[in-house]
Regions:
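Catalytic cores of nucleic-acid ligases and guanylyltransferases
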Residues: 1-231
Length: 231
């Protein structure tokens, strides 16, 4: 846990409240290099497509830039609501497509996003890595600090085969970046623990730092990346 478990003052009429149709996503601010700071949570910048997952009344809808019907491109994720121990939730995360060996594959992802499937079927196995929780039990959490939202996310989303919560560390940005470079990941995500979620530029709330992987570039499995082994 990052901090104390989030306790939500849920209103009695929360079951009748509906999730918003769309949410303006927060965008990361670019910085020059990885850094250390006890006020930040560091994790991989996942090589995939940004996606919001809306879970309501046992149904799933997704918001992905450029896709009018994301579920049609990622039908294997239809059962995501069964994994979320929450009703009226919105998750912020990244869509990946894995090859036969379980490695994130940019070309397989591109084909899905372009709708280049055969009779609605696509090669590769999709996965969704959740990084933030914007709504829970029909209540908006965007004014809560990231540390509380992340703790709540870990509590309501147990690990599964296709949908998982990524691993990260507080303070040790340069160490995490070194580990990610060895895994072929070219970006580091840094989220300020005390920051609210706001649409548009994240400024100090969410930063992205570049990482330079070695050549030839490694292509590890998602399972190995999730373990995030630190030297």
């Amino acid at each position: 846990m990052i901090g104390d478990q989030l306790k939500l003052p849920l209103p009695d009429d929360r079951a009748s409240r509906r999730l918003p149709e769309r949410i303006r996503q927060m965008e990361a601010e670019a910085v020059d290099a990885p850094f250390d700071d006890p006020e930040y949570f560091f994790e991989p910048w996942w090589p995939g497509a940004r996606a919001l997952a809306f879970v309501e009344s046992g149904d799933l809808r997704m918001q992905v830039s450029g896709l009018s019907d994301p579920i049609a491109a990622f039908p294997e994720l239809r059962d995501l609501p069964e994994q979320v121990l929450d009703e009226g939730a919105v998750l912020d995360g990244t869509l990946l497509v894995l090859d036969e060996e379980g490695r994130p594959d940019a070309e397989l992802l591109r084909r899905r996003l372009a709708g280049n499937g055969t009779r609605g079927r696509y090669p590769g196995r999709p996965a969704y890595v959740a990084s933030d929780l914007l709504w829970s039990e029909g209540v908006s959490l965007v004014k809560r600090p990231f540390a509380a939202r992340r703790d709540r996310l870990s509590a309501v989303l147990p690990a599964g085969d296709r949908v998982i919560v990524g691993r990260g560390y507080v303070q040790e940005g340069t160490l995490v970046a070194e580990a990610l470079a060895g895994l072929g990941i070219d970006g580091l995500s840094a989220r300020r623990l005390s920051s609210r979620y706001r649409g548009g530029p994240g400024r100090e709330a969410w930063l992205r730092a570049p990482i330079t992987p070695p050549e030839p570039r490694p292509r590890p499995t998602l399972a190995l990346i999730l373990r995030l082994p630190l030297s």
